[in-house]
C-alpha cells in the first residue's frame, strides 16, 4: 500500500516538472531574450522539482522520530490498551 501511495505523486510531479522543463522552452517566442527565458524555465523546473523531491523524501524516511519521556509512553500505552 505504501509503495502505491508514494509512487503516484512521484510519477505525477516528475511528469509535470519534466513537461515544464522540456516542453516549456518550445513555446517561448523568438526574441532577443529567448535564451534567458528558456534558461529561467529549465532552472525553475529543476529547482522546484528538487525542492519537492527532497521534501517528500525527508517525510518518507525521517532521520529521527518524536522524543517522548518514559512517563508519556507509559501513559499513552495505558490509554490505548
UniProtKB/Swiss-Prot annotation:
It holds the Pfam family ATP_synt_H. Belongs to the V-ATPase e1/e2 subunit family. The keyword Transmembrane applies. Residues 1-7, 57-81 are lumenal. V-ATPase is a heteromultimeric enzyme made up of two complexes: the ATP-hydrolytic V1 complex and the proton translocation V0 complex. The V1 complex consists of three catalytic AB heterodimers that form a heterohexamer, three peripheral stalks each consisting of EG heterodimers, one central rotor including subunits D and F, and the regulatory subunits C and H. The proton translocation complex V0 consists of the proton transport subunit a, a ring of proteolipid subunits c9c'', rotary subunit d, subunits e and f, and the accessory subunits ATP6AP1/Ac45 and ATP6AP2/PRR. One of its GO terms (cellular component) is synaptic vesicle membrane. GO terms for biological process: pH reduction; proton transmembrane transport; transmembrane transport. Subunit of the V0 complex of vacuolar(H+)-ATPase (V-ATPase), a multisubunit enzyme composed of a peripheral complex (V1) that hydrolyzes ATP and a membrane integral complex (V0) that translocates protons. V-ATPase is responsible for acidifying and maintaining the pH of intracellular compartments and in some cell types, is targeted to the plasma membrane, where it is responsible for acidifying the extracellular environment. This is V-type proton ATPase subunit e 2. Its main location: membrane. Expressed in brain (at protein level). Residues 29-35 are cytoplasmic. The keyword Plastid does not apply. Keywords: Cytoplasmic vesicle, Glycoprotein, Hydrogen ion transport, Ion transport, Membrane, Synapse, Transmembrane, Transmembrane helix, Transport. Glycans are attached at residue 70. It is a multi-pass membrane protein. GO terms for molecular function: proton-transporting ATPase activity, rotational mechanism. Disulfide bonds: none annotated. InterPro entries: ATPase_V0-cplx_e1/e2_su, ATPase_V0-cplx_e1/e2_su_met. It is found in: Membrane; Cytoplasmic vesicle, Clathrin-coated vesicle membrane; Cytoplasmic vesicle, Secretory vesicle, Synaptic vesicle membrane. It comes from Bos taurus (Bovine). The chain crosses the membrane at residues 8-28, 36-56.
Amino acid at each position: 500500500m505504501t509503495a502505491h501511495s508514494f509512487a503516484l505523486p512521484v510519477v505525477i510531479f516528475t511528469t509535470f516538472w519534466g513537461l515544464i522543463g522540456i516542453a516549456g522552452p518550445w513555446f517561448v517566442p523568438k526574441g532577443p531574450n529567448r535564451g534567458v527565458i528558456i534558461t529561467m524555465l529549465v532552472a525553475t523546473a529543476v529547482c522546484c522539482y528538487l525542492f519537492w523531491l527532497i521534501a517528500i523524501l525527508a517525510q518518507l524516511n525521517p532521520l529521527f522520530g518524536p522524543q517522548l519521556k518514559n512517563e508519556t509512553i507509559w501513559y499513552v500505552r495505558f490509554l490505548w490498551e
